[in-house]
Swiss-Prot record:
Coiled coil: none
Organism lineage string: Bacteria, Pseudomonadati, Chlorobiota, Chlorobiia, Chlorobiales
Residues that bind ATP: G80, P81, E82, S83, S84, G85, K86, T87
Encoding gene, per UniProt annotation: recA
Function: Can catalyze the hydrolysis of ATP in the presence of single-stranded DNA, the ATP-dependent uptake of single-stranded DNA by duplex DNA, and the ATP-dependent hybridization of homologous single-stranded DNAs. It interacts with LexA causing its activation and leading to its autocatalytic cleavage.
Protein name: Protein RecA
UniProt cross-references to SMART domains, sorted A to Z: AAA (SM00382)
Keywords: ATP-binding, Cytoplasm, DNA damage, DNA recombination, DNA repair, DNA-binding, Nucleotide-binding, SOS response
Superkingdom of origin organism: Bacteria
Sample GO molecular function, one term: ATP hydrolysis activity
Any one Pfam family match given in the protein's UniProt record, by short name: RecA_C
Subcellular location: Cytoplasm
Family listed: Belongs to the RecA family.
Entries under InterPro entries matching the protein: AAA+_ATPase, DNA_recomb/repair_RecA, DNA_recomb/repair_RecA_CS, P-loop_NTPase, RecA-like_C, RecA-like_N, RecA_ATP-bd, RecA_C_sf
């Protein structure tokens, strides 16, 4: 007659001591073979329950994403029509990462990087790593090497549509190359996602839209590079220009809407709107006014805006001018809005737009 194995308390549950011993032996063997951290209990505190993020440079979009920005250790896809603000948004993420002391890189497959524009958005050009690869294979190999180094905080690939497979480059004009790019992306992402997760890198793929032929019902729009990027992305952002901004007859920017169409780290399908000004990027002042009104920090009556008992001015442009010239007032309003949005306050520098 044999006695039952004694029970051991583990996380409030009784576990068979013999099973626990076998489990510990298995874990030790796995860590010896594959390294420390190969397998861990979620309750150990080292399993990464908290999602770390890098700000997008937009308070509204950070709020819509649910974790305060783009998640580290994940793949993000930013897509939309031409001139919708895709690269602008990615450059703002780079600028925010650099403010925190992060190392950033851009793989410019389009060979169209504008350093003067990036500088206007707050990017430190001298600290930015840039590569202009000749083929899609070279571009993705560069991304893999940067990610596996564990030293890079943000890698931007601009864009997926420009990742031309080597076989297509070596072929003649008019040669069929159907499926080559999709296979390239699928193979690369299978290798990249694990490395990205371990390195805590924000990996951004900028993508373009194409029209599917012969679609009678539903949206004819699709992104380039096959379905792999849609599958492996933890966050997908659909960015669109919804209105033009004018100062008299002069076009000064565009009203932009971003929809979080996929989000594995928070509830999806939330939206954010902000102004993108030509030559300046996301308007922090305009966004603060909009969010202030939305959360009741700033009162709006007709075209007049007020803060508490103080009248700020008539029209958004006059209020922007007042906030630009009064950093203390800017900070007060920003802290109140931030507190209402996320439950905590954070001091940031006043913008100089």
């Amino acid at each position: 007659m044999t006695m039952d194995n004694p029970k051991v308390e583990q996380a409030g549950h009784a576990v068979d001591s013999a099973k626990l011993k076998q489990l510990n032996l298995a874990v030790d063997a796995l860590e010896k073979q594959f390294g420390k951290g190969t397998i861990m209990r979620m309750g150990d505190g080292s399993a990464g329950l908290t999602v770390q993020a890098i700000s997008t440079g937009s308070m509204a979009l950070d709020f819509a994403l649910g974790v305060g920005g783009l998640p580290r250790g994940r793949v993000t896809e930013i897509y939309g029509p031409e001139s919708s603000g895709k690269t602008t948004l990615a450059l703002h993420v780079i600028a925010e990462a650099q403010k925190e002391g992060g190392i950033t890189a851009i793989v410019d497959a389009e060979h169209a990087f504008d350093p003067s524009y990036a500088r206007k958005l707050g990017v430190d050009i001298n600290a930015l790593l840039i590569s202009q690869p000749e083929s899609g294979e070279q571009a993705l190999s560069i991304v893999e090497t940067l990610v596996r180094s564990g030293a890079v905080d943000v890698v931007v690939v601009d864009s997926v549509a420009a990742l031309v497979p080597q076989a297509e480059l070596e072929g003649e004009m008019g040669d069929s190359s159907m499926g080559l790019q999709a296979r390239l992306m699928s193979q690369a992402l299978r290798k990249l996602t694990g490395a990205i997760s371990k390195s805590s890198t924000v990996c951004i793929f900028i993508n373009q839209l194409r029209d599917k032929i012969g679609v009678m019902y539903g949206s004819p729009e699709t992104t380039t590079g096959g379905k792999a990027l849609k599958f492996y992305s933890s966050v997908r952002l659909d960015i669109r220009k919804i209105a033009q901004l004018k100062d008299g007859d002069e076009l000064t920017g565009s009203r932009t809407r971003v929809k979080v169409v996929k989000n594995k780290v928070a509830p999806p399908f939330k939206m954010a709107e902000f102004d993108i000004l030509y030559g300046e990027g996301i308007s922090a002042l305009g966004e603060l006014i909009d969010l202030g009104v939305e959360f009741g920090v700033i009162k709006k009556a007709g075209s007049w805006f007020s803060y508490g008992t103080e009248k700020l001015g008539q029209g958004r442009e006059s209020v922007k001018k007042i906030l630009r010239e009064d950093p203390v007032l800017y900070q007060k309003i920003h802290m109140q809005v931030k507190e209402l949005m996320t439950g905590h306050t954070e001091i940031i520098s006043s913008p100089t737009e």
